[in-house]
From Swiss-Prot:
Microtubule-associated protein (MAP) that plays a role in the regulation of cell division; promotes microtubule stability and participates in the organization of the spindle midzone and normal progress of cytokinesis. GO terms for cellular component: centrosome; cytoplasmic microtubule; midbody; mitotic spindle midzone; mitotic spindle pole. Residues 572-589 have a biased composition (Basic and acidic residues). It is found in: Cytoplasm, Cytoskeleton; Cytoplasm, Cytoskeleton, Spindle pole; Cytoplasm, Cytoskeleton, Microtubule organizing center, Centrosome; Midbody. One of its GO terms (molecular function) is microtubule binding. GO terms for biological process: cell division; cytoplasmic microtubule organization; mitotic spindle midzone assembly; positive regulation of cytokinesis; regulation of microtubule-based process. Residues 398-454, 508-602, 620-642, 654-683, 699-836 are annotated as: Disordered. The gene is Map10. Keywords: Cell cycle, Cell division, Cytoplasm, Cytoskeleton. This is Microtubule-associated protein 10. Residues 524-541, 590-600, 661-683, 699-714, 722-745, 772-786, 825-836 have a biased composition (Polar residues). Interacts (via middle region) with microtubules.
Length: 888
């Protein structure tokens, strides 16, 4: 008991870095270590050794560790014997000893060094790079059987077991329990223990550190090789006991494989992915997160049209609240992890809505970007409280519902009518389809409109026709029938009526809120019937059976009541113009032959004029609104008087180009005014040349861009007389006919374009190629004839025209921008797309507008919208203009 109580526990760790031999070896040698009379520890080289660190070196990079129970007196001069052995191919022959060395162990000190290996005759054979450490773990516990009980609860009774095996990983230390009676336990890195125990030869001549007998050393290494071969073959071990014990060997039971950590067995650390999946169990959370999207695809789609880029409205919050009630309350914190931009993409709960609004108010630049994107996407913010206080003045015009101006009121009404028409068309019975699921029990009123991904907004293009032929031929037939029906409706209504586009409506609300309210008659006849079309559109009931075409496809309303409203509004504007034209007939005494010739020239192209393509609301409101943005507030009341019916001489009458203002101001004709109008019309002519191919099918009438020149030239005539107006008016009428007959199919404008360009091509894709050729030749001839007649009437106009062409173009371009800056609330956002070198010109143009006469202002305002066609404001339009056949 005294001897047992004096024993201590030590830990021996060995790591072989590399071995280098002076003479090359045919096979990789093994390194064996032996301390005192313990069984040797064999370390085998790896199967695929690493690149040699030195010339002729063999990389090991592995080692072993074991626990020793010794008396302190046995380690007075502890020497570790290291031997380099050449292993045979088969376990029968004895291993060949290549070299050996002695290493002095110092307890509790770890050392790394290179030791010289010497052969049996003390010659140098190589070097061994080794790290070793002997650690004193303290006094061994008095109850020795307690350590032995988990090892062999039933089978190990007084006999000792030895297990020698090779670790599979680099520097993985495996414990080995030994004592003076030669008991050793060593585990493999992969956790497999002895499976086929086989007895080993008993060591009759025990080798110690001081032995020099070569035969005894050779027998001792043979014993180590037998153990190592058994372990390296199939992880089996050979239980043995050295000579001093004198006990019989008994096989170890298979229960040794059930060792746990209490036996000081070093096992590899558990892999994180094998345990975290069971602890976290994220499968339930994943189901909860995906569930609202899987069960309610309609609800999420319904929330998108109502969701504004700054903050969601109340309806998506209700939807989300109803959806979240079915899921655990853990998900209520998920939207808080989203950023301000992501929170706007999807509806968020009420508690996160306030935090999102607060975060947006702290980020004014982000707020401005979101507001600009909302305006460009035709989604004005409904709640002005979510706008940053410093930016509220920018978007004040976008949040107003009713406005004192009649135009703004009609636009807001038309917007609400469009929305209600969408809801009535797309969601006929929303409650009957969704309430059985229990999703919308809290929703009051009609749910938000459902987003339809296959909606045709820009007419039937060539690209869409080709896609539909491959994917859905049935829908292609439906779309072609709708195109034919729309064209027949347009022929019945007339060439002048157009549905305005969406961007002008958004951009001109703030500008028109500064204009005084107008009379109903003025509203109907303003700017060639564009406002009358607004009034008709705002009065359309949303319950029309065909009202979907007005909202989705941009054609005219396809009902009899709608056609009557459109025709009545058009006739009223026409009667107002006829009264003013008859009043101005007295001033028209010169140029009757010219007008007759113009009428005769217009006759051949009248069949092509009757085919007037429709326009979508998104691309149509733009044309009607740019003119109103450019005009100053003081000129808004003069629009009915300035308005002209240049293209109304189709019935054979004279071209009427004088207004009621001619009777008040009979200004003598001046060369400068005529030359200015001529140069401006030449600038307009530059944008009417055919530049597109026929790859686009959205047929659009060029006459949509005529209202601005009509009003501008009418203002010229009212101020400068009828003599200068006849030649330019004749040119206008012929050019209008040629452009009407030769308009081209243009692609839709991209929604991301801040300012949609007015540039359009002028070649109409008709089913009759002869009609197209005749219309083009007629337009060329008419423009050439008009230029010749003008040169005859005014011989000196060509020189002045060349001299003033540049200045007029400069004034037109800058005047449009300056007036747009002063009258549109949206230009503060679009100004980032303007060239930076125009600031001085814009300031100069503003001074010119303030100091010039009213007629000059009208010229600038009228033709300013034409200059917008000379600029490409968006990369999408550059692609469309330069690469025909591509739509964005």
């Amino acid at each position: 008991m005294a001897a047992t109580a004096a024993e201590r526990l030590f830990s021996l760790e060995l790591l072989v870095d590399w071995v280098r031999l002076d003479s090359p070896c045919f096979a990789s040698p093994a390194v064996a270590f032996r301390l005192l009379d313990f069984p040797p520890l064999l370390i085998l080289p790896p199967a695929a050794p690493d690149p040699e660190p030195q010339r002729g070196a063999i990389t090991f990079g592995r080692g072993k560790a074991c626990l020793l129970r010794l008396r302190p007196a046995a380690l007075r001069r502890p020497r570790l014997r290291a031997a380099l052995l050449q292993l045979p191919a088969v376990p029968t022959p004895a291993p060949l000893l290549l070299g050996a060395c002695d290493i002095l162990l110092v307890p509790s000190v770890g050392q790394r060094g290179i030791f010289t290996l010497r052969g049996p005759e003390a010659e140098r054979v190589g070097e061994l790079a080794l790290f070793y450490r002997l650690t004193d773990l303290g006094r061994f516990p008095p109850g020795a059987p307690q350590l032995r009980s988990p090892l062999s609860p039933a089978c190990i009774t007084g006999s000792e077991a030895l297990e020698v095996s090779e670790p599979r990983t680099k520097e993985t230390s495996k414990p080995c329990t030994k004592d003076t009676s030669a008991r050793c336990l060593q585990c493999v890195s992969n956790g497999r223990f002895l499976e086929a125990p086989e007895p080993c030869a008993k060591d009759t001549d025990n080798w110690s550190a001081g032995d020099s007998d070569a035969s005894a050393v050779q027998k001792s290494w043979e014993e180590a090789i037998l153990h190592s071969k058994a372990s390296s073959g199939d992880m089996a071990s050979a239980p043995c006991s050295p000579a001093p014990s004198g006990r019989t060997v008994s096989p170890v039971s298979l229960e040794v494989t059930e060792l746990d950590f209490e036996t000081n067995t070093f096992c590899p650390p558990p892999l994180y992915y094998t345990h975290l999946t069971q602890e976290k169990a994220p499968s339930a959370r994943v189901e909860i997160t995906i569930e609202p999207q899987r069960n309610e695809p309609e609800d999420l789609e319904d929330a998108f049209p109502e969701t504004k880029p700054v903050g969601p409205t109340i309806r998506p919050v209700k939807h989300t609240r109803a959806a979240i009630q079915e899921s655990p309350p853990v998900l209520l914190n998920l939207p808080q992890m989203q950023g301000p931009g992501e929170a706007n993409e999807a509806p968020c709960p009420p508690q996160t809505e306030q935090s999102t609004v607060g975060a947006i108010r702290q980020l004014p630049l982000l707020n401005a970007l979101l507001m600009e994107l909302s305006l460009l996407c035709n989604q004005p913010v409904a709640n002005p409280s979510q706008v940053h206080p410093h930016l509220a003045w920018l978007y004040r015009g976008e949040h107003k519902g009713p406005d004192p101006s009649t135009k703004s009121t009609s636009r807001s009404e038309s917007k609400s009518n469009k929305l209600s028409a969408q809801e009535n068309e797309k969601l006929v019975s929303p409650q009957s389809t969704k309430n059985p699921k229990g999703k919308h029990s809290k929703i009051s009123g009609s749910p938000p409109p459902k987003v339809t991904k296959g909606r045709l907004l820009y007419g039937l293009t060539n690209t869409l026709r080709l896609r539909l032929q491959q994917t859905n031929p049935g829908m292609l037939v439906v779309h072609e029938k709708r195109e034919q029906y729309r064209r027949s409706q347009i022929r019945a209504v007339g060439p002048k009526f157009r549905i305005p586009s969406w961007k002008g409506k958004v951009s001109s609300l703030a500008a028109e809120s500064q204009m005084p309210p107008q009379l109903p008659g003025d509203t109907l006849t303003d700017s060639n019937g564009k406002v009358s079309s607004w009034a008709v559109q705002s009065q359309l009931p949303p319950q029309l059976p065909r009202d979907r075409s007005l909202d989705s496809y941009g054609s005219f309303a396809e009902g009899s009541d709608t056609s009557m409203l459109i025709s009545s509004g058009f006739d009223e504007s026409s009667r107002t113009r006829e009264a003013k034209q008859s009043h101005a007939m007295k001033k028209e005494t010169v140029g009757q032959s010219e007008n007759k010739t113009v009428t005769s020239l217009r006759a051949p192209v009248s069949p092509a004029v009757s085919v007037i393509p429709e326009r979508s609301p998104r691309s149509n409101i733009l044309r009607g609104k740019w003119k109103k943005q450019v005009q100053s507030p003081g000129l808004s009341r003069q629009d009915p008087a300035v308005d002209k019916a240049v293209g109304e001489g189709i019935d054979g009458k004279q071209v009427k180009a004088a207004s009621a203002a001619d009777t008040n101001e009979n200004r003598p004709p001046s060369r400068k005014s005529s030359c200015e109008s001529t140069s401006e019309l030449q600038c307009w002519d530059g944008s009417t040349s055919p530049c597109y191919s026929e790859d686009f099918c959205t047929t659009e009438n060029n006459s949509r861009s005529l209202p601005a020149p009509d009003s501008s030239t009418g203002a010229e005539y009212a101020q400068k007389g009828s003599w200068a107006s006849k030649s330019s008016e004749a040119r206008l009428s012929t050019r209008k006919n040629s452009s009407e007959s030769s308009s081209v199919f243009t692609p839709p404008f991209s929604a991301g374009s801040p300012v949609c360009s007015q540039k359009r091509s002028r070649v109409l894709k008709t089913h009759d190629s002869l009609e197209e050729a005749s219309s083009l030749s007629t337009s060329d001839f008419s423009s050439q004839w008009t230029n010749e007649k003008e040169n005859q009437a005014d011989p000196g106009s060509s020189k002045i025209r060349r001299r003033q062409d540049r200045s007029t173009k400069l004034k037109v371009g800058t005047g449009h921008k300056s007036s747009e800056k002063s009258h549109s609330a949206r230009t503060s956002q679009v100004s980032s797309y303007e060239p930076s070198n125009l600031s001085e010109l814009e300031l100069k143009a503003i001074d010119d507008i303030d100091s010039a006469s009213t007629g000059f202002q009208e010229e600038e305002d009228g033709l300013g919208s034409l200059r917008i066609s000379r600029q490409c404001r968006d990369i999408c339009e550059l692609v469309i203009n330069k690469l025909p056949g591509y739509t964005v």
